[in-house]
Amino acid sequence: MKHGSVPATPEAASLVFGDRLEAAELYARILAGAGVEWGLLGPREVDRVWERHILNSAALGELMEPGERVADIGSGAGLPGIPLALARPDIHVTLIEPLLRRSEFLRETVTELGLDVTVVRGRAEDREVRDRVGEMDVVTSRAVASLDKLTRWSVPFLRDGGRMLPIKGERAEVEIEEHRRVMESLGAVDARVVRCGANYLSPPVTVVDARRRAAKPGRNKSGRTARSRGRTGRR
């Protein structure tokens, strides 16, 4: 894939990516080259590709546990999923992207970086995609949609107690209050704002952290009881 020129690697990158720093630097060049050429990154973003995009995404790794299965919905150029996979090789990342051209970019990028990352083309809200991806511990996203829509797309992927961790902006706390009722009706509870990367990013990354409520005994994930599924009605 086409590589572009990027600013000098910030010192924080070596701390975040460790022995995968060279792969992170390669990803930065891919974003600056093919990413711009394919329309996935604006040309003006190249100068801040590290702080605004790569380190910003990788900071999310502070919230992950070893071995967790993480889905990045609406992955686009691979943000936040690819930096997250580079920073945290002990988790498994799946990138979900509905557009063909973008999913091709993701597959080529993952191959060039040598990452064990799964790319699934499809819409997060489609049942077929959920069946292919399977149950996740975490669902994340970045600049994809409003919090109510993200909840509707994210919760069906999550195991009971799993977390949705979308990267949000300065209005995150306001957005939680605006959509809390809808989120809770969809099964996302205990929503709060957390911040990551404070040691090397200014401002730090703002993330909404919400947990999938455990299903009540006797209910499946759609909310229907086993008894109601088997009921045939009176004759």
UniProtKB/Swiss-Prot annotation:
The keyword Cytoplasm applies. Pfam families: GidB (PF02527). Keywords: Cytoplasm, Methyltransferase, rRNA processing, S-adenosyl-L-methionine, Transferase. It is found in: Cytoplasm. GO terms for cellular component: cytosol. It is an enzyme of class 2 (transferase). Residues 213-235 have a biased composition (Basic residues). Residues 211-235 are annotated as: Disordered. It comes from the Bacteria. S-adenosyl-L-methionine binds at residues 74, 79, 124-125, 142. Coiled coil: none annotated. InterPro entries: rRNA_ssu_MeTfrase_G, SAM-dependent_MTases_sf. The keyword GTP-binding does not apply. Its EC number is 2.1.1.-. One of its GO terms (molecular function) is rRNA (guanine-N7-)-methyltransferase activity. Specifically methylates the N7 position of guanine in position 518 of 16S rRNA. Belongs to the methyltransferase superfamily. RNA methyltransferase RsmG family. PANTHER family: S-ADENOSYL-L-METHIONINE-DEPENDENT METHYLTRANSFERASES SUPERFAMILY PROTEIN. HAMAP family: 16SrRNA_methyltr_G. NCBIfam families: rsmG_gidB (TIGR00138). This is Ribosomal RNA small subunit methyltransferase G. It comes from Mycolicibacterium smegmatis (strain ATCC 700084 / mc(2)155). The gene is rsmG.
